[in-house]
Amino acid sequence: MGKWTDKLYITHSEWSGEVGQHSASSGITGRNSSGGFKRLPFYCCSLSLQPFEHPVCTPDGIIFDLMNIIPYIKKYGTNPVTGEKLETKNLIKLHFHKNDKDEYFCPVTYKVFSDHTTIAAIKTTGNVFAYDTLEKLNIKAKHWKDLLTDEPFTRKDIIMLQDPHNLEKKDMSKFDYLKNNKPEELEKRKPINNINVAGMGNTKKVFDELQKKNSNEDDNKAIEKKEEIPTSFHKKRETLPYNAAHYTTGEAAESFTSTVVNAYTASTRALIDEDEFMYKKIKKKSYARIITNYGNINVELFSDKKPKTCHNFIELAKTGYYNDVIFHRNIKKFMIQGGDPTGTGKGGESIWKRYFPDEIKTTLKHDARGVLSMANRGKDTNGSQFFITYAAAPHLDGLHTVFGKVVGGLDVLSKLESIPVDEKDRPEREIKIKQIQMFVDPFEEYQRRLKNKLTHEANAERENEEMRKRREKEEKMGWFGPSVPKIQTSGGGGVGKYLQSTKRDNSEISNEGEELQKKQKITKTTFGNFDNF
């Protein structure tokens, strides 16, 4: 059986390391990591390290700005990245493309370029594409023509500008002119050298001091920003809409799993359709009265079971859509049909100005006299037309949506059934709907409750905000009134910062001394003095 050799303390060799004191930021490992990989973005010039305006590249795919690389080649004649010999005739002009959002993208697939995109260019034309595009449309298809200009090229003409799996060309720590610290190129990148201060006396010194001061301020701001760690109690809680779903829109997952979609990291709640959200809250039935020229028919609507159909019927009735509309079809021992403003049986529309789907439930059937159901032209073609059965019609089950029944006025229904009709089942005497009155409307009640709830929440949020401001104001009040922030003296901090507040004028001290002596002379008496006792 082996022995446990791991010690419960740090040994001397572990502390000392290979070259001295060992810690996460010192020792040979720390020194090697301090000068680690520094990546240059694909849209930056490899010489100025700034975004390029006139991009060109070398045959091995190193990108420069034309205005920067030409003077360098004329002076040194080498590649600033590799240190190898380079001539201006070897430079290849590149044609990058941007979308409406000013982002570089592939002009064929519209894929936005990022640091993780493999980017390639065609040497003969200079057009820049995503390498995936060239691989699918050129290499695998053996179509050796530029996808934009249709100019021929060979496989050797494909230049890799960025390969996420091979970033040696983008490693700034290995750039030749940076490793060798060429003074002219380092000086060119200073902003002060972009200003012509020649012949302006000591202006250059002023600019240098100003630049040093600005850099120190930027460093201090960066440190302060880093120290400000946002916490959950500093953020105002997001108010969700009343119809927010318990699931998200899925945009974040879509952007992470698809290379075509731009990155999206927010978790946004999906919103349920307002009507669909309302239908789930309806638990009551509706009641209405159909007023005809032959009498009144009271109906009960199954709003709790067929909310969409009942909502359509109720809203049409409340807007007067059914006023003065006739029953255009009347078949004895079967049904009476109406709800078409044109009176032809071919018109009528829903409140959404389009057909809406059926709400078929096996528990509600055409199994009795006085069943209220929707007329349609086929599956999911409901509009405004409806019919009332004179007898059971089981052959209509599963084809039409039953959404109510007659609960009063069956004698009026018998009168309507007895009216003679022509050969097209059209009543010979006009049967007209004068009006449809609503007695109980759960949809209107829901809207009223929802409005009151939203108003109450808005008022509560406003009151909470006012209370928070009032509490902050009260906390700022001290024992002797509002707390006044202390004004810092010109002496600043450090040693002796309180000395200035204790300085006094010598004349003031001397005056106080004279007044004190006068008071002592006035109050001095011989009584109680035992000096000569």
Curated annotation (Swiss-Prot):
GO cellular component: catalytic step 2 spliceosome
Matches recorded under Pfam families: Pro_isomerase, Rtf2
Compartment(s): Nucleus
Spans annotated as Disordered: 454-533
Domain PPIase cyclophilin-type: 284-438
EC nos: 2.3.2.27, 5.2.1.8
Keyword Metal-binding: no
UniProt key word Cytoplasm: no
Pathway info: Protein modification; protein ubiquitination
Domain U-box: 38-111
Disulfide bridges in this chain: none
Catalytic activity as recorded in UniProt: [protein]-peptidylproline (omega=180) = [protein]-peptidylproline (omega=0); S-ubiquitinyl-[E2 ubiquitin-conjugating enzyme]-L-cysteine + [acceptor protein]-L-lysine = [E2 ubiquitin-conjugating enzyme]-L-cysteine + N(6)-ubiquitinyl-[acceptor protein]-L-lysine
Compositionally biased residues, Polar residues: 523-533
Compositionally biased intervals (Basic and acidic residues): 454-477
Family note: Belongs to the cyclophilin-type PPIase family. PPIL2 subfamily.
UniProt-listed PANTHER family: PEPTIDYL-PROLYL CIS-TRANS ISOMERASE-RELATED, RING-TYPE E3 UBIQUITIN-PROTEIN LIGASE PPIL2
Described purpose of this protein according to its UniProt entry: May catalyze the cis-trans isomerization of proline imidic peptide bonds in oligopeptides thereby assisting the folding of proteins. May also function as a chaperone, playing a role in intracellular transport of proteins. May also have a protein ubiquitin ligase activity acting as an E3 ubiquitin protein ligase or as a ubiquitin-ubiquitin ligase promoting elongation of ubiquitin chains on proteins.
Protein name: Peptidyl-prolyl cis-trans isomerase-like 2
Record organism: Rhizopus delemar (strain RA 99-880 / ATCC MYA-4621 / FGSC 9543 / NRRL 43880) (Mucormycosis agent)
Gene encoding the protein: cyp14
